């Protein structure tokens, strides 16, 4: 809503220039030089230049900032990992540079055919250096301090209640933006959301429960599309018995995902997931098809194999297996799913699993939290990828204590990740991704359960509303019929 990248996705989902006018790539595929559009401005009217992009990208890779999205950059940018993780390279020495006000250049550690898609993701969006330095940690906390460069800007903010955005007159494409105001209202109860939409109080509802699905399925008001994210569970691979891949795979194969999605969650629109790459990503060889559909499942539910693996690991019929737990944040939905998983493991494998809700602040805390400190056996996680390419999924598991907190150490996987960042393309890249999923299906540091779906109820008077692959709403191309 408020930010725009070098590139963006248009109304048809095509990658097109936004802040950038054009780009060039060096012969070795490692240096990208972007030419920015002339006359770009921040929402306060101040100039937006290549220096803002240099500052912003370096800020994400600055270990003192501690950005959670840094892995997206350090996975491809030369010396990024050494800067953010190893701290052996100064952020000032990174090969991210403004050559002049409209020319921005970056060097990659290796050719990456998907790099341009990264420049349309959240981690790569610019922030105003002047604004961040003036207001510090509060730079984005109020309309008075927040300067942006997207189609809309923040006009009013009532925390946990509502946000009001108004058209940004300084947006480079402002003449094409037809809506003057977007009001975001936070309604906690799904039934309240449905009632508000039913009564015409909402033009768009992005929280759609099972009752709303039943009421609007088959109508033009229900909008649904794949979202490149999923619900999954992490194993703590540093703790016995979950340091044994056979145990992790056994628990993964013993889950009936259809019961979870259609029975427990009562949502038949949620695709069950049998691989680490979610639906909603175009195939490498044939981009008219979904990668997941072309490649097929990386594993299948198989209780007999699960029993055999558990016996091979020294726990025949679950004998001698310690009581363990699933941890999650307080939620009736998450509790019901955890109870169902525990019941399946008890029924099929003879295992005793406790379910434990942990207060959200404790669960998600950066250093001392449940996941960050490793205080779990199995932990709930939900995640939406930063960009629509399989590499975005594989990068999540590259660092044992990065975005995923699995504490999984696998040199063979790291070797494949390094190969992933080479200049291979086409069928060779597709085969590499298959190999990476096959390895994950054997090692199982994580258990994918189901794919997210971006559903919304959209009033008949709204035209042109879209959501990108991340599920983020896009109002740039919307019109409202009076």
Please report, for each region that a protein language model flagged, where it lies by residue.
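N-terminal lobe/hinge region of extracytoplasmic solute-binding protein
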Residues: 1-27, 147-148
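Gly/Pro-rich hinge or "lid" segments in bacterial periplasmic/extracellular proteins
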Residues: 11, 101-102, 107-177, 181, ...
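Surface-exposed binding/hinge segments that line
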Residues: 35, 54, 68-130
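Alpha-helical secondary-structure segments
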Residues: 49-56, 101-107, 150-151, 179-181, ...
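Ligand/substrate-recognition segments at binding pockets and active sites
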Residues: 159, 303, 307, 311-385, ...
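Ligand-site clamp/hinge motif
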Residues: 169-215
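Detector for C-terminal structural segments
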Residues: 254-286, 333-343, 368-482
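Structural transition elements
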Residues: 271-312, 331-335
């Amino acid at each position: 809503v408020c930010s725009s990248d070098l590139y963006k996705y248009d109304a048809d989902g095509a990658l097109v220039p936004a802040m950038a006018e054009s780009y060039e790539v060096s012969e070795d595929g490692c240096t990208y030089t972007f030419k920015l559009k002339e006359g770009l401005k921040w929402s306060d009217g101040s100039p937006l230049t290549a220096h803002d992009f240099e500052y912003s990208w370096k800020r994400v890779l600055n270990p003192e900032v501690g950005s959670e999205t840094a892995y997206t950059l350090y996975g491809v940018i030369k010396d990024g990992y050494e800067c953010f993780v190893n701290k052996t390279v100064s952020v000032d020495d990174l090969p991210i540079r403004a050559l002049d006000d409209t020319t921005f250049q970056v060097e990659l550690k290796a050719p990456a055919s998907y790099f341009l898609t990264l420049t349309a993701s959240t981690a790569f969006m610019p922030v105003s250096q002047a604004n961040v330095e003036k207001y510090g940690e509060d730079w984005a906390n109020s309309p008075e301090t927040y300067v942006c460069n997207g189609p809309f800007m923040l006009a009013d903010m009532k925390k946990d209640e509502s946000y009001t955005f108004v058209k940004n007159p300084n947006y480079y494409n402002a003449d094409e933006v037809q809506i003057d105001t977007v009001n975001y209202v936070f309604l906690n109860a799904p039934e309240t959301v449905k009632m508000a939409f039913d009564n015409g109080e909402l033009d768009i509802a992005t929280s759609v429960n099972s009752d709303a699905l039943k009421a609007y399925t088959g109508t033009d008001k229900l909008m649904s599309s794949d979202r490149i994210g999923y619900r999954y569970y992490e194993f703590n691979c540093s703790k016995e018995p979950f340091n044994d891949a056979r145990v992790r795979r056994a628990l993964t194969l013993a889950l009936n995902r259809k019961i979870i999605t259609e029975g427990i969650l009562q949502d038949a629109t949620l695709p069950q997931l049998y691989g680490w790459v979610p639906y909603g990503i175009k195939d490498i060889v044939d981009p008219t098809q979904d990668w997941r559909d072309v490649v097929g499942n990386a594993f299948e539910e198989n209780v007999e194999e699960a029993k055999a693996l558990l016996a091979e690991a020294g726990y025949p019929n679950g004998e001698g297996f310690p009581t363990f737990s699933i941890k999650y944040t307080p939620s009736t939905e998450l509790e019901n799913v955890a109870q169902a998983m525990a019941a399946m493991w008890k029924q099929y494998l003879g295992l005793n699993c406790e379910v434990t809700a942990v207060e959200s602040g404790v669960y998600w805390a950066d250093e001392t939290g449940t996941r960050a400190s490793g205080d779990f056996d199995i932990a709930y996680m939900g995640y939406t990828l930063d960009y629509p390419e399989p590499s975005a999924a594989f990068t999540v598991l590259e660092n044992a204590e990065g975005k995923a907190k699995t504490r999984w150490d696998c040199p063979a996987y790291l070797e494949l990740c390094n190969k992933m960042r080479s200049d291979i393309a086409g069928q060779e890249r597709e085969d590499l991704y298959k190999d990476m999923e096959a390895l994950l299906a054997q090692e199982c540091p994580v258990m994918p359960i189901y794919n997210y779906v971006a559903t919304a109820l959209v009033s008949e008077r709204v035209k042109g509303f879209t959501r990108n692959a991340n599920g983020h709403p896009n109002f740039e191309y919307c019109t409202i019929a009076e």
